[in-house]
């Protein structure tokens, strides 16, 4: 199952907006990591809506994370760890995956983080 990019929506509302960076006026890397976990939860909800039961997930194949970043920010992998750690918590070894973490200028709706996922499911 290929899940399109998920942003940190909670109750239909974007949980936070802005670029990730250090200092005032930016989303902190710690907060962005939490938001990446929210993106991962939203991705799991999308998978469940298609396959009916998350027990059908054999493994998480790949995660691609995008982080709207201040030009001097280079901690994108640490931010996307929020998603990776959640998949590990939910699926154990089956949650281990290939991953990319990319810094970008902006994301849809002003989101600080976006996560897309590929999972392999049983028939």
Regions from the language model: what does each represent?
Residues 1-123:
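Short, polar/acidic, helix-capping and beta-turn segments at strand->helix junctions
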């Amino acid at each position: 199952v290929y899940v399109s990019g998920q942003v940190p929506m909670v109750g239909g509302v974007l949980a936070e907006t802005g670029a990730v960076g250090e200092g005032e006026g930016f989303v902190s890397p710690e907060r962005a990591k939490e938001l990446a976990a929210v993106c991962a939860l939203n991705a799991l909800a999308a998978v469940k809506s298609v396959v009916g039961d998350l027990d059908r997930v054999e493994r998480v194949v790949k995660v691609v994370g995008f982080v709207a970043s201040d030009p001097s920010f280079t901690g994108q992998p640490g931010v996307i760890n929020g998603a990776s750690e959640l998949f590990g918590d939910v699926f154990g070894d089956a949650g281990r995956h290939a991953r990319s973490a990319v810094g970008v200028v902006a994301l849809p709706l002003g989101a600080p983080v976006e996560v897309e996922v590929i999972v392999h499911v049983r028939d």
